[in-house]
Amino acid sequence: VYFRLTVEGETVRNVELTSGHVHRGMEAMATQRNLIKNTTLTERVCSLCSNSHSFTYCMSVENVLGITIPERARYLRVLAEEIKRVASHLFNTAIQAHIIGFKSLFMHVMEVREMMQDVKETVYGNRMNLASNCIGGVKCDVERDMLDYILGMIAKVEPAVDEIREIYDTNSLV
């Protein structure tokens, strides 16, 4: 914010205000790209929650342009978001164990997270940036066999998460 003051003695007679932000980094890059290319750019904001950024970006653009996406695309977006969310929470849980020096718990949680990373890679072809969202819907479908694979992996992850939660709830080191 910049102020240009006109003063007489100690009395301010006029103030000219220039406000605004200096766009740097990704903001500046976004001004040079089109809406579609910005979808990819938004995924690069953070690798742990990359899908969240492209999800909300696409929703914002769709709302502004009055685009209604198909119901199946909404489900597929949520599916990708949930897979990514579970992996992200497991990573953060592992980091908490690492910070307090509980190395075996850190390794265990990272092994469980690895199962979710495998799901991301198998379903979306990538372990970090899923690149599943696009303006108007999603880039890929999830067929029945892939859904069965996801459900099978969740069946393995869920008891492991229960075990991890039990450790966090009861172990005096945590």
Regions found by a protein language model. Give the residues of each.
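Active-site bordering "gate/hinge" segments
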Residues: 1-174
